[in-house]
A protein has these predicted regions:
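N-terminal acidic leader/helix
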Residues: 2-34
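Acidic, low-complexity intrinsically disordered segments
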Residues: 25-78
């Protein structure tokens, strides 16, 4: 699960603060709308396994990019 908060969209980028389950540190994310890719990000030490969580956020921004984005979104999978 990943919670995206404070989602903001400009012509070039979508930014947000991500809260990954079991991780106490928020992560700043920036999605490049032209490249349709997440810009480089920094995960806290020992949280390399969270890369897949960021990938889910990236896929969400790719699909929701043309519609109006909410200020907050929770993404869950199994």
């Amino acid at each position: 699960m990943i919670v995206l908060k404070n989602i903001k969209k400009t012509i070039e980028k979508i930014t947000c603060i991500a809260y990954i389950e079991d991780c106490n540190m928020p992560i700043s994310l920036c999605f490049d709308r032209k490249k349709k890719k997440m810009e480089p990000f920094h995960l806290p030490d020992n949280y390399a396994w969270c890369t897949s969580h960021i990938h889910h956020a990236e896929k969400y921004f790719c699909t929701a990019e043309k519609s109006e984005l909410p200020l907050q979104r929770t993404i869950m999978w199994y």
